[in-house]
Amino acid sequence: MPSVDDVLEQVGEFGWFQKQAFLNLCLTSVAFAPIYVGIVFLGFTPDHRCRSPGVAELSQRCGWSLAEELNYTVPGLGPAGQAFPRQCRRYEVDWNQSTLGCEDPLAGLAANSSHLPLGPCQYGWVYDTPGSSIVTEFNLVCEAAWKVDLFQSCVNVGFFVGSMGIGYIADRLVGSSASWPPPHQCRLGRPDAVAPDYVSLLVFRLLQGLVSKGSWMAGYTLITEFVGLGYRKTVAILYQTAFSVGLVLLSGLAYAVPHWRSLQLAVSLPIFLLLLCYWFVPESPRWLLSQKRNTQAIKIMDRIAQKNGKLPPADLKMLSLEEEVVTERLSPSFLDLFRTQNLRKYTFILMYLWFTSSVLYQGLIMHVGATGGSLYLDFLYSALVEFPAAFVILLIIDRFGRLYLLAGSNLLAGAACFFMIFISHDLHWLSIVAACIGRMGITIVFQMVCLVSAELYPTFIRNLGVMVCSSLCDLGGVVAPFLVFRLTEVWRGLPLVLFAALGLVAGGMSLLLPETKGVALPETIEEVERLGRKAKPRDNMIYLQVKMPEPAGL
């Protein structure tokens, strides 16, 4: 009986049908980018100072320039270590009193302005930006600055819950295309733009996370199931590269639309176009076969043949899953991930790699917004380096193997973060170059750890293993905002110290995994154990054929 891969070899492994489905699903990957990293623009914190009643009138009466107004009325202006008093405290002075002069108005109140009492910003803030963000609208600064971190953490909590929930729905209840939820992603993106208060914004952000990553994962799985074996690696990498296209588009869109509500609408409304694509993506024939819906699977394979201009094989009606030859099916259990010594080691290492890849990836993106340069250009530069990262993977993965590429990329990202610690604040361009190098390294890690995870687990717990390990990626995204923004307040280089340590340790731990290049996917836990003892690629095996002499007289 032919399998799906056997039929694809005859009707086209990457023909017109697959290309059309690939393009449609890539739109989902593009649309996911603003949700994943939109915090850089939605939560941008501009320079700010306390609003003091009477200052504007006094400045106008005295004819002060902006620099003079700040010098006379804002405490702690100047020294780098005085950011908190400058942005979060005000002089407790009645600026409306007539005794204040225009030349150093505070001189008559105290010999030194540092002796004047300071108070909280009870009248709000003045923000030095022509646009707006959730920070400027809801005053998420000073003592409330942690609420920006919570805003980003909420979407990652949604990723964590939603990816498992939609994965369960896709596997248990409906087909992959039916679980592909761009309509819900669009509906839940629009309320963000009209949220009346901060609490409502958090709720909508959480709900958006529930469906958005599941949408991306469903598309990833679906397109790899439609193409032949020889195209799966390339298609998977290019699907993730479409996410990078979304990053580039986001930087230009954020520059053109500097107001956060309008930006949120701009990135949500185009998802309506995905509704048109939704009807052109059928269910996965592999999933249909696993649900014993062979007739529907055969119809879809026949449709693929017609779209590709090929004739379906004569034995198409006997289409089946390769797994059907197995008479006994094992039931996966969470404990199976830790059942043996090698499997335990691989699981813990992969969990750490998923966690660190998320922390470094999101951390480097958010760190760009805290460096003080051109937010839009810096974001664009760091997004562009993801394209050569995909090219590097396609070029050398089959030549050098998985482990060296995974370990080397982790070490590169960690070393780049370590180097950034010692770069002077005046050399902003050098800091961006180092950040881009680190970003390229961690982008490679993100794509490689997904591949290695799938290749190390035996078949009956492969989906479970990848799901559990990748959930650490979402947990990393939950803590990353707090690590970046709160540690930066202590010392600008402190997040980089942590990122460097995580990346360098991850590089060393990657070498403890077995090489899977050219090795058949393990079917049982016993095969995983043998893989750990001697991870010899199939390409290095030598087969000898012994020809026996023919018996005499024949």
UniProtKB/Swiss-Prot annotation:
Glycosylation sites: 71
Residue(s) at site: Involved in affinity and selectivity of cations as well as in transport activity: 450
Catalytic activity line of the entry: 1-methylnicotinamide(out) = 1-methylnicotinamide(in); dopamine(out) = dopamine(in); serotonin(out) = serotonin(in); (R)-adrenaline(out) = (R)-adrenaline(in)
Site (Important for interaction with positively charged substrates) location in chain: 474
Transmembrane segments: 25-45, 235-255, 262-282, 348-368, 377-397, 403-423, 432-452, 465-485, 493-513
Subcellular localization(s) per the UniProt record: Basolateral cell membrane; Apical cell membrane; Lateral cell membrane; Basal cell membrane
Superkingdom per UniProt: Eukaryota
PTM annotation, UniProt: Phosphorylated.
Entry's Gene Ontology cellular component terms: apical plasma membrane; basal plasma membrane; basolateral plasma membrane; lateral plasma membrane
Extracellular side: 46-234, 283-347, 398-402, 453-464, 514-554
Pfam families noted in UniProt: Sugar_tr (PF00083)
InterPro entries, alphabetized: MFS_dom, MFS_sugar_transport-like, MFS_trans_sf, Orgcat_transp/SVOP
UniProt GO molecular function: (R)-carnitine transmembrane transporter activity; acetylcholine transmembrane transporter activity; monoamine transmembrane transporter activity; neurotransmitter transmembrane transporter activity; organic anion transmembrane transporter activity; organic cation transmembrane transporter activity; prostaglandin transmembrane transporter activity; putrescine transmembrane transporter activity
Miscellaneous comment text of the record: Involved in the uptake of clinically used drugs including diabete treatment medicine metformin, neurotoxins 1-methyl-4-phenylpyridinium (MPP(+)) and iobenguane and platinum-based drug cisplatin. Also involved in metformin efflux transport. Metformin competitively inhibits OCT1-mediated thiamine uptake, leading to a decrease in hepatic steatosis. Plays a role in the anticancer activity of cisplatin and may contribute to antitumor specificity.
Known function: Electrogenic voltage-dependent transporter that mediates the transport of a variety of organic cations such as endogenous bioactive amines, cationic drugs and xenobiotics. Functions as a pH- and Na(+)-independent, bidirectional transporter. Cation cellular uptake or release is driven by the electrochemical potential (i.e. membrane potential and concentration gradient) and substrate selectivity. Hydrophobicity is a major requirement for recognition in polyvalent substrates and inhibitors.
Family: Belongs to the major facilitator (TC 2.A.1) superfamily. Organic cation transporter (TC 2.A.1.19) family.
Entry's free-text remark on domains: A large substrate binding region with partially overlapping binding domains for structurally different substrates is formed by several transmembrane helix domains (TMH) including TMH 2, 4, 10 and 11, and it is alternatingly exposed to the extracellular or intracellular side during substrate transport.
Protein name per Swiss-Prot or TrEMBL: Solute carrier family 22 member 1
